[in-house]
Amino acid sequence: MTVTEQEFLASYPQKVAPGGPTGYPGNLTAEQEQKLGELKMILLTKGYEDRTDDATLLRFLRARKFDVPLAQEMWENCEKWRKEFGTNTILEDFWYKEKKEVAKLYPQYYHKTDKDGRPVYVENVGKVNIHEMYKITTQERMLRNLVWEYESFVRHRLPACSRVVGHLIETSCTILDLKGVSLSSASQVYGFLKDASNIGQNYYPERMGKFYLINAPFGFSTVFSVIKRFLDPVTVSKIHVYGSNYKEKLLAQVPAYNLPIKFGGQSSSKIGVELSDDGPWRDPQFVGPEGLAPVAGERPTGAPSIVSNSSTYAKSTASTKVGADDKATDAKANGNGAAAAAAGAGTAAAGGAAAAAGASSSKQAAPAQAAPAQAAKAPVPAAAKTATAPAPTGKTAAPQTNSFPPEMLAMMEQNEKKAEKAAEAKTKGGAAPQANAFTDEQLAQLNSLPQQVATGGVSQPLPDSHVTQGVPTVAKIAEAAAGPHEDAHLPH
C-alpha cells in the first residue's frame, strides 16, 4: 500500500500540546503566522510541493530565528542535499546488513519513549572501536545508515509517538553515554561524529528535545561551562551533564519500565536493547498508513510506502543500490578495499567526500575513475558530500564545523596526562597529584577564547539536531577524560 505525503501527514496529529513555547504548530504569534505564510508562498511559487507542511517549515524558521530568507536558503539547501543523497528512497534501497556487528562495536539505538512521549535514542561513544568497525563497514556507509535512521525516525517513530499522546511529537530524548571515553577513543570517532553532526544541524534541524550526557569525565563540565555561553540558550536548556550519579535524573524523564537496565531502569529485550528497536512504532495500534518501521539490518523491500505529492518524486532504485551495497559489504568483509570502493560507488563516494560542501551545488559527483565494471554501472551520488551547508549570502551563517583551536586541545591533552599520572600514583599507593584540574591560567585562557572556539565562526545560534547539537564539541570536550567523574547539571 502506498499513500501520498499529504495523506500520511493527515494520519497523525499536526499540532503540539497546548501551553508550550510559541513558534510551534498550533502555537504561533501573529508575526510567526505571517512569516510561515511568507515562506510557504515563496516555496510554492517556486514549484516546491513536498515538505512544505507547517511543521517542517516551522522547524527551519526556528533554526533561523524566523528570518525568512535564511530559512528559505537552509530549506532549499536541504532539498538539494536530499535529491543528491537519495534520501527520499533510502528506506527502500539501503541495506545495512552489517548492522548487528557494528552495534557490538558502536552501540546506537532507539528504545521506547520518555515521559513526554519522545523516542529515546541511546549512543555509547566510549565503547567505540573504530579500527575493528572499519574491517566490516566504512564511514560512508555509517553516515548513510545515520540518514536511514533519521528517515525512519521522521516517517515511522515520530508519527507513532504522536498518535500515542494525541499531539505532535517532533523531537527525541537522547542519552549519550561517555563511559570509557578517553583522548584516543574520542579522536577515533571524531571524524564520523563531525560529519554526523553536520547532517543533523543542516538537514534535520530542531529535532532535539532532551539531551543527557552521562558518565561525563572530570573536567568536562569546566570546558562546557565556557562553551555553553556561545550556544543558543534554548539549546543549552535542553542539555544536561552528569557524572556517574545520573540514574535519578534519567528516571525523572524516562519511566523505569522504558529505561534500559544498564541505566538503572527495568527494560530489557531477549535480543538486546541495541537491536530490539522497541517502541510504539512496533505496535500495530499506533502504526498508520506508513506501515511498520523497517528493521535496521534487514534487506529492504524496495517498495516505498509514502510517495510524493508531486510527479517529480525520485523513483526507487532499490534493485541497483541494494546490489551495489551487497558487493561493497562482501568485498569489505573479504579485505578487498579496492573492490569495496568500486562496488559501493552506487551508494557512497569514497575518501574525503564527507568533507565536501555537497549542499552548495546541485551537480552530481563525477563517476568513479576506477576500471571495475561495478563502478561504471553505478553512478556516484553527490550524496556522500555530507559535510556542511553553504553560508547564506549577505546575512550570515558560516558552515557549522564546531572545531577547537590548538590551544584548547593542548590544554585538554595536558589534563589527560595529569589524570594518567594520578591513576598511576594511586595504584602505587603514593600521594596522587591533582588530576584533571585546570589551572587558573588555563581557565583564564579558556574564558578568553573567542566565540569561534565553540561555533566555528557561526554568528547564528546553532540549530538543534536530533542526535545532538554539536556532537564534535562534545567529542572534543570528552578528550579531557580519564579521571574521576563529576556531576554538573546545566540549569534551565
From Swiss-Prot:
Gene Ontology molecular function terms on file: phosphatidylinositol transfer activity
Pfam families listed in its UniProt record: CRAL_TRIO, CRAL_TRIO_N
Family matches, as InterPro entries: CRAL-TRIO_dom (IPR001251), CRAL-TRIO_dom_sf (IPR036865), CRAL/TRIO_N_dom (IPR011074), CRAL/TRIO_N_dom_sf (IPR036273), PI/PC_transfer (IPR051026)
Gene designation per UniProt: SEC14
Record region (Disordered): 274-310, 377-403, 454-492
Function field: Required for transport of secretory proteins from the Golgi complex. Catalyzes the transfer of phosphatidylinositol and phosphatidylcholine between membranes in vitro.
Compositional bias (Low complexity): 377-398
Membrane topology: Peripheral membrane protein
Gene Ontology CC terms, in alphabetical order: Golgi membrane
UniProt domain CRAL-TRIO: residue ranges: 98-271
Keywords: Golgi apparatus, Membrane, Protein transport, Transport
Entry protein name: SEC14 cytosolic factor
GO aspect biological process, one term: post-Golgi vesicle-mediated transport
Compartments it resides in: Golgi apparatus membrane
Keyword Protein transport: yes
